[in-house]
């Protein structure tokens, strides 16, 4: 793991971290009990098993 040679100021740290952005999970259409909903892929199987409530 890279180790910084010098301490980084708080302003520089926050500036660097603020560049990172989270992306929305891609959604897939799922048909459960005749209703079509859009869910993230990791929740598809849980929805089919009835573990996740879909509106």
Curated annotation (Swiss-Prot):
The keyword Ligase does not apply. InterPro entries: Ribosomal_bL32, Ribosomal_zn-bd. GO terms for cellular component: large ribosomal subunit. One of its GO terms (biological process) is translation. Keywords: Ribonucleoprotein, Ribosomal protein. Residues 1-21 are annotated as: Disordered. One of its GO terms (molecular function) is structural constituent of ribosome. It comes from the Bacteria. SUPFAM superfamilies: Zn-binding ribosomal proteins (SSF57829). Residues 1-19 have a biased composition (Basic residues). Belongs to the bacterial ribosomal protein bL32 family. NCBIfam families: rpmF_bact. This is Large ribosomal subunit protein bL32. It comes from Corynebacterium kroppenstedtii (strain DSM 44385 / JCM 11950 / CIP 105744 / CCUG 35717). The lineage of its organism: Bacteria, Bacillati, Actinomycetota, Actinomycetes, Mycobacteriales. The gene is rpmF.
